[in-house]
């Protein structure tokens, strides 16, 4: 069985005629991110992330685009979930590595955010990702867990893991550095 077939793809569908004949579309919508961010400035980072998780505030556009959700948030920790889908595939028939990188950037950044006071923000300064195994539709639901490693006044670091919910197998892991600004 090919890697493509193991991940849920069809090795025979990769022909030019098959690819051209099966065009698909996908649409999504989102809320004004500036309005959501303005509301978030009134809340602690943990309150803000939990409000998004509870549906009290809309998720950011990137979450709507990729279809991931915050499923847990505690002080210094954030967990996201996503269902791998065909539209996320790269040219060789598996989920594009940018999906795992985005999940890691999001869960680690939100882990940092949960430690911040109202009105304090952050931005990613660096992101390192290590890929362990490929994702496909057959992988099933995937979780991304970020944990705060260091939370200072000016900088913070976090680590994260992306893994299959059903089997716990590690897909990717990473670290991030963030600049804190008030």
Language-model region placement:
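Terminal targeting signals and extreme-terminal segments of soluble enzymes
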Residues: 1-182
